[in-house]
Structure formats: structure tokens, C-alpha cells
């Protein structure tokens, strides 16, 4: 974990260029820790700590380096480039745009390092073949296994570089959704977990504000049976902003956008008006949900049903507080009536992934937050004789 070098880390500082700006940083601190903890460049991701996974890849004088294996003093006087510098003009670099177009990111954790390695590759070989791509990315591990799409993204980046007049993609992070709240100022939370409370007893409006709530209760689950996921609710406010709940959703497979589209189609509202509330994991800042593949078959139909029922009782008036509990089986819209699906929506969070703006639990910082780390002895069989834990009691 970054940030653990100790109280003497700032005794001596050196100057290095980071994204074109001269920075004075502690000489003995790891480059990874300095970039993240000192400069707030959290697009550089901690991973294995041994230079094996590539999630912390940066460019040093244009060449890929694992930041976890370098001290700041190693890059004194050199030019360090992180993912944050690529889209600083407000539009995506062609490599980033290619990753978005192809959908080359899934969870997005390895993506900043991948993008920088591809950038260095194209600087050396403008039109690489698959073998050259594989060799260049050998130091970057994708835990989700999206390597075929990453290769296609590299070829697409070459095409974008050869095309004149191609409009660059907007680099605005999370452009099609509104924030659920900052971890340091979290949104209101239920007084009692809603999955342990009957729908009519939940404090809907204290948490979500005035509006219409439609609930599809969970079906009784037979012992030993597979969950049907047939439980969902949504809230529509006076401005036609919709919050929908489906339990946990996938990350990276774009089910989040697909589930939002179901709601948008049924309610005839823009996709940007719909946000998803994940289940219990939504209480963890920057949590990415679950990594399965059953979000759509488990949750999709139930979500479409609550949206279809909501459509029959709209419009919503300002100041309205109304809860509708579904007892029948609402008729959902046929796919032939859809207007927004299939029209080229950018996958949820993909721009965040390629720009380094996507946040994970390891990126959370709070006032007074302490860091822990495993400190290994320099000699085999060494024994800890003394520990200064005074800072922990401050």
C-alpha cells in the first residue's frame, strides 16, 4: 500500500518533472507513493508491489516503468508522465478513445497502465502487429482477461491516427450520470436496512426526497433454489430523475448501462436521467459491485416491470409522496418500441477508466486516515526488536 515509507521520508527532496511540471518530492519515497499520496495522481494504481502486474505503469522519458519499483531519486531530473496528463485538454487521446470505442476496459483497474504502455508502443512502432502488441504489453496484467479487445483497441488507435478530421471524444468523466455523493459527505442513508424492512415501512422520502416509489417485492425463495432476483424498486422525482435498485450489478460488462436503458425506455426519459443504486456494497465508497454475469437475467425483467408500472401512474407532481407496491404482472414494452437502445451509448464509466478518474476503495482518502503495510526484514530470520507506534496514538 502506498504512503508507508515512514516519518523520515521527507528528510531529503529531489526535483523531477511530473506531467510537465517540476515537483519536489521525498527522495527515498517510492515513485508510486509519491505520485498518489503527495500529488493525488490516483490513476497510478497499486497492485502487486513487485513490478509484475503493471497497474502502476507510468512513462519515464517516454518509456514504460513500474512506479512501485522506482524511488523518487531514481527519476530525479527525468520526465514522468501519468494517465492524468493525456486528456488534460478536455478531449481523449486517440489511444484512450480507441479503448472506449472498442470497450477494451472491464473493471478498469489495469487500464491506465495499459493505455500508457500502448502510447509508448505506438511512439516506437506506429503500426504494430499482434506479436508486437503482445510483447509491449507483456508487463501489464489484465485480471479480467480483455486481451483480444485490447489488441483491437491498439489497431483502432492506429486507424484514428491515420484519419484526418476525426472528432476527438469528450473526456468529461461520468458525463451521462449525476453523482451519488462524495464519500466525505455521503448522501442520506436509511435508518434501517431496507432489505430488512417491509416496503411500506421504509423511509423512502427521507433518503430519496419527494416523488413516486414503485416496488416489486421479492418472491418467496424455496429452500435450495436459485434466486430469481425478482425484486426491484425505483423512485421518480418531480424533475423526472430516476433512481432504480436491482441488487448488485456487474462492472465492466456494461450491464449497468443496459439496466439503465430498460428503465429509460419504459419511462421514456433520457438515459442520463437514470442512475442505479447497487445493493449493500453501495455503502462502501468507490465499490465496484459484483463481478458475475447474471445481473441482466436475474434483475432485468423485474426492473422493467417496476418501470412499466411507474409509467402507468405518472406524471409525478412536485411534493408528491406516493408508494406503489406491485401485486400483478405489469406488461413491459416490446423491444420494437425502444428508441434509445442500440444508438451508441458510451458504456457506463468507460471514460473514467481510460482517464484514470475511476476510483476504487484503495483510492479513498479521509482526514486522519492511517495506512498499514507489511514490512519485510532485510535479512532472513530477522526478529522485530522495537516498534515505534507513537504516531498511531496521536
Give the location of each predicted region.
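Cofactor-binding beta-sheet edge motifs in enzyme active sites
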Residues: 2-17, 22-29, 42, 48, ...
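Flexible glycine-/small-residue-rich
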Residues: 18, 60, 82-84
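Ferredoxin-type iron-sulfur electron-transfer modules in oxidoreductases and energy-metabolism complexes
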Residues: 27-41, 69-183
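Alpha-helix C-terminal capping segments
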Residues: 59-61, 266-267
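Short, hinge-like loop/turn segments at secondary-structure boundaries
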Residues: 62, 125, 292-293
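Glycine-rich phosphate/pyrophosphate-binding loop shared by adenosine-nucleotide-utilizing enzymes
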Residues: 65
